[in-house]
Amino acid sequence: DKNASRLNLSIVRVVCDGRSLHKVLAPTSFDAILLDVPCSATGVMRRTPDVKIIRRKSDINKFAALQSELLQSVWALLKPGGRLLYATCSVLPQENDAIVGSFLSTENTAHCMILPQKVGESTAYGQQVFPSVLGGDGLYYSLLGKPFL
């Protein structure tokens, strides 16, 4: 809501906190989900150097908890046979592989999918793109699949 106002966007409608989407939308509503979670923004420090000043170590744990809750919440909205792309603009493993790995260890209907095209360095559960000398941002992504029942 704040970002929509800041960007002067009138087409954005906030329905609820993403952690409550499973309460508002029907289960298995989506074939695919892009979950671009709030994060520390450590991958975009090149463009937003204030991140170095405003971020605290304790913020990372708060973001990680929120990321886990969001992933758990939206998983119920994914149809069997569906795919979920988990993404951050972070280069920190605590917000990336640690979140996906923890989720996979507790959610027996989830598995990592092989990405058809890979950009960045392979990690245990996804791909990490580091900020580039060519001017690109850092980011992480992992493709998760839900098998047909």
Q: Where are the predicted features?
A:
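S-adenosylmethionine
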Residues: 1-149
